[in-house]
């Protein structure tokens, strides 16, 4: 399924990040080590990431002074995934690295192949609303960071959401992926069943427990109003990850499997499930 923004409207690329601080001579090493640790635990727990084994990583800074980095994962010259790492302030201590997003497949965020040409484009990361900001003479244009599609000129970005998440909702240093579950092994197109288009304002909210304990084969769709609801983007939910029993991530299909924090997904979107019936004996992993 190819997501189109028109469907619904309403090396280390710069060595290790060129933001290394003189007062933190070990920053590069800490960053590199942490990324490798996260990659290792993902590969060990989820076979969908097997191509990450013995993969090469390159990183680049996302925007000036944003404290966010895109990590490109390649193996044998092929793109096999990516991670987005943030840096969270810690009073009196070194800033803490946090895992904002990660994905597997040949398409990553802010791929040079899809970058706007012949114009200056600034990468802006904010989960599903990630985009290149292109300053044209007559207006500002937003270009989707995953597909390279330009949004209509009327679309404007809002305040970032993913940076408002508390660290407790994100994977942090030394934490491991402790549980993984595949809801659907086959790629699903949310447009095959469009019940999510109906008014669902009175439906019960689908919780993390509902998702994890789901025993039926019906699809789960996450709908996300983007850019002040000018765009409605539906995503098929494929997998679930749980880090150290507290940080939950939802894997959706978006030109590849893309994991974002569950807390972020709940802030920006709504889950739709045909049936979230679960066995009474089911339990969440520790």
Positions of PLM-derived features:
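A eukaryote-biased signal for long
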Residues: 177-286
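Sec/Tat signal peptide C-region and signal peptidase I cleavage site
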Residues: 16-22
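Short, non-transmembrane alpha-helical segments in secretory-pathway proteins
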Residues: 23-63, 103-121, 167-223
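Exposed beta-strand-loop-beta-strand "reactive/processing" segments of non-cytosolic proteins
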Residues: 47-89, 125-142, 240, 251
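Bacterial N-terminal signal peptides that target proteins for export
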Residues: 1-6
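Bacterial N-terminal signal peptides
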Residues: 7-15
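A short, surface-exposed interaction/processing loop segment used at functional sites
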Residues: 83-129, 143-179, 254-286
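N-terminal short leaders/motifs
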Residues: 22-33, 75-84, 91
């Amino acid at each position: 399924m190819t997501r189109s923004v028109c469907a619904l409207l309403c090396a280390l690329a710069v060595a290790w990040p060129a933001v290394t601080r003189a007062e933190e001579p070990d920053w590069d090493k800490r960053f590199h080590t942490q990324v490798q640790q996260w990659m290792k635990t993902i590969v060990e727990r989820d076979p969908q990431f097997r191509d990450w084994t013995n993969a090469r990583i390159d990183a680049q800074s996302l925007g000036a002074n944003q404290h966010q980095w895109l990590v490109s994962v390649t193996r044998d010259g092929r793109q096999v995934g990516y991670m987005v790492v943030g840096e969270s302030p810690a009073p009196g201590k070194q800033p803490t690295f946090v895992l904002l997003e990660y994905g597997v497949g040949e398409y990553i965020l802010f791929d040079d192949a899809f970058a706007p040409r012949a114009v200056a484009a600034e990468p802006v990361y904010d989960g599903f609303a990630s985009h290149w900001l292109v300053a044209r003479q007559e207006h500002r244009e937003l270009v989707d960071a995953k597909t390279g599609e330009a949004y209509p000129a009327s679309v404007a970005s809002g305040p970032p959401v993913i940076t408002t998440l508390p660290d407790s909702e994100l994977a942090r240093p030394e934490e491991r992926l402790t549980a993984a579950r595949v809801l659907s092994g086959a790629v699903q197109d949310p447009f095959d069943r469009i019940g999510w288009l109906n008014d669902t304002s009175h439906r019960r909210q689908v919780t993390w427990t509902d998702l994890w304990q789901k025993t039926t084969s019906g699809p789960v769709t996450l709908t996300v109003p983007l850019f002040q609801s000018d765009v409605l983007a539906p995503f098929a939910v494929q997998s679930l990850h749980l880090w150290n029993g507290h940080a939950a991530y939802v894997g959706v299909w978006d030109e590849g499997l893309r994991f974002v924090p569950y807390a972020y997904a709940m802030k920006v979107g709504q889950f739709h499930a045909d049936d979230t019936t679960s066995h009474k004996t089911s339990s969440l992993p520790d």
